[in-house]
């Protein structure tokens, strides 16, 4: 039996002697590498926090002391140490979530994958404890992987600093290798000294005594304070935390469990907000990750353990198509620039950055700033393309509405991972954008069905100079190209009923990547004698007027979209028909309006009846019901 086999909960961990902790850390890393190699996941960040997470669970009493993980992809080790070692189905249906999950364990307080939020949760929890007179619980927030580049984190820090008696320990996991831990004993001595109440009392007494001295008192205090601050700045980074009024200790070697435990205990016992700055190495202990210059295996699919090479996934990816076309457009138009929110490689902008390094701006995890900065770039005569995951666009809705659309600025938002993404669960499904963006004036939305249309629509979007545009596309492999058999206005017709059909039964509006499924449905219904027209609007906001005219020729209209059913394209189509006084039923087939558990995209679609079989069955019933109703409505002869 391995040492890891004996650890089932934090109490077991606390019983281990210090001498066995390095072995435990090594076994955890071996476990992570072997398991994530089969399932895929966030390997690099978790290899970097093994010792840190061990120390957290030895010092604090989880779940009584809440441990909040910002960018929750750092929580794999936390799961292991809290009794969740079944990683065989990590991020798969019925298995462990890739993020903290309240449904999984009482040790998980927040289901967190959108960054920069943990400190606000911590502030609220600590205020609640203070208000209720609870003085023996410490709130711990682990932030890192760029979370402190988000403005929300600094808003929270500013508020946390006001609570002088709130028990909050903020652990900054610094895996950016920006600071050197080889500062020596003097820095550790200063850190230990400052983390005592006696030191605080001594400072207050000395300050009062010096300031009371006639003539020279205040100038002398200012001079000594400046010397002290300058010395601290010289030997310690990140003194901005103390400028906010927060106590700071570090940097600490995050791979030295004993050193981290000492720092955490002093922070815990201080009884007020404290920053503990630890230095870790992303990908620690696995050479292929350590040597991976791009992102130290931040997130990846299944891979070969011996080499670190990913298992091949055949097929062209949507992100790759966007990446390639952006480089081509960049060569043709020098005014096209790109913005990313700490997602240069995942969103496909790395190639553009390599080709045009002066025309890419990585603003950190700051989507709000990205949107308004893009508006400024547009005002300056450029055309910015903001590449962001669809789920993260939610974070800057006000900026899109008021800073970009209100000013009619030509900004293109490229929304990657739109629709159901699957493996990463509720927080990463991009199923909200088509709904929330419907209300934005002056905004146009394009949804490509294949690689050819993604290239076309991206170019069309960038050519629009009197308002913002959105191009959304899913995660994964691009389906085969579906050629249009006809065009009506700006829409592509993908299927027509058999010749001789006077009045087609069904108009099937296929939104973007749902086109392939809709064409399969049309073929199934045709075998049953049901006449179906399949159209791809290409641009779903504003709707092409030709869609209304085409709908008038059919008995039923059905809209199939990879978005929440409420307030999206289906509702827009129904509203357009009502405005035209057309009494034609419109049925919307989209994602159920709930937070979805992690599973494969195809599996989730099938469960919701959004696969070809489920849609064909339902649409057959709808067409039959409509035909019966039409017969009943006919006047008696």
Swiss-Prot record:
PROSITE patterns xref list: TRANSKETOLASE_1 (PS00801), TRANSKETOLASE_2 (PS00802)
Residues where thiamine diphosphate binds: 73, 113-115, 146-147, 175, 286, 367
Superkingdom of source: Bacteria
The entry's keywords: Isoprene biosynthesis, Magnesium, Metal-binding, Thiamine biosynthesis, Thiamine pyrophosphate, Transferase
Residues involved in Mg(2+) binding: 145, 175
Pathways per UniProt: Metabolic intermediate biosynthesis; 1-deoxy-D-xylulose 5-phosphate biosynthesis; 1-deoxy-D-xylulose 5-phosphate from D-glyceraldehyde 3-phosphate and pyruvate: step 1/1
Its biological purpose: Catalyzes the acyloin condensation reaction between C atoms 2 and 3 of pyruvate and glyceraldehyde 3-phosphate to yield 1-deoxy-D-xylulose-5-phosphate (DXP).
Assembly with partners or alone: Homodimer.
Full protein name: 1-deoxy-D-xylulose-5-phosphate synthase
Organism: Thermobifida fusca (strain YX)
